[in-house]
Amino acid sequence: SGWEIIATGGTQKLLEDSGVKTTGISDVTGFPECLDGRVKTLHPAVHAGLLAMRSNPEHMSQLEKLGINTIDIVVVNLYPFKATISKPGVTFADAVENIDIGGPTMIRAAAKNYQDVAVVVDPRDYERVLSELEAGGITLETKKYLQYKVFAHTAVYDSLISNYLAQQLGIRFPESVTFAYEKAQDMRYGENPHQGASYYNEEFIRVGSLSKAKQLWGKELSYNNINDTNCALELLREFRDNTEKIAVVGVKHANPCGVALADTTAEAYQKAYDADPVSIFGGIVVTNGTVDADTAAEMAKIFLEIIVAPAYTPEALEILCKKKNLRVLELPGIREELPEGLLDMKKVMGGLLVQEFNQGGIGELTVPTKRQPTEKEMEDLLFAWKLVKHTKSNAITIAKDQVSCGIGPGQVNRIWAVEQSIERSGEAVKGAALASDAFFPFDDCVKAAAAA
């Protein structure tokens, strides 16, 4: 009681229908809402009431002369621009019509005068504000927090609009960039225990991305868990078009350690495990096949950090959910195509590197040797090539029968990577295929591979 509620069109009708007495915005401004609601609150009677500093006698005197009352609390939900452009088939005209003008103007004005006006843009803050009102008044600390929320909110809102308009114009790398992300979770620590960390979702979460995954079992994901799992999913995506085979990818410290294609998930997992049974311990396993009881039973024999799959049978979950330290994630849409225009970003000290997301495959192949590769050899070459694309440089991968044999990642010279991958391949190196993530500057790598 004691509060006068000023409301615009739709909000006023909802409140009045619910038995809440309101004052229409037109009664405050003395001017009707017009242009299909485009102009409602853009009026001095509103903005002077928001911006007048109560501690400034001149401000208060001017309000009195103009017959304008102060406004103490503003509650606004902006037009749903994000929801609008997320709809399939949305037109440019519909998108533009859902760009809020009066709302952002009003909440920014209110936030500037934070000492006198509380402004609420996030429904999650309603309870806090109401409890303080019931206790006697909104504290200055809360008003400053709400001020911050306003400018963060409008920054995200404007970012969505500018990025949408840039996309419509085909602008890949604009003069300035802003990206909107929403916090998904805080983490116990980052890459190392002394580093704080959080995980943020993109405003538009991509189908098949880690942010879409549903955690079925286990503790919260750590910083390193998310980084490694993302690396595994990016490699797994290379096999999305192979609908005849199931792929299993094992990753350790952001590098593949065992990768295989097979007719069943269980067979593919066993081959991936056998490729490097030492490194996969404590690793990440992702697959584009359903995990059944047989697969789960094999997976449960060792310590794995995370398993990601599009689906699990009830029997598989019963087995896996007995593993205390395992995280089990379900990710439908794991074979979905990525949209065009994705960007890859890397923060560097004082700047941001932005490039097109690497969705490139192999175009036309040239065989300079007299002997052409057999169909099977070509299959293994292409398989090894997909692996090396997602292995830290200098990288060499060796594969046979569409299973990784030896992976040599992150070496400072290429011959070391070759020697490492050959050593790890063991006897399987005979008749295998080798891929390199860059050219051979000298013949030493070729000679080492031929000698193996």
Regions found by a protein language model. Name each.
Residues 1-24, 108-109, 115, 121:
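N-terminal phosphate-binding or glycine-rich loops at protein starts, especially the Walker A/P-loop
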Residues 123-124, 128-176:
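Non-catalytic interaction/clamp surfaces of large macromolecular machines
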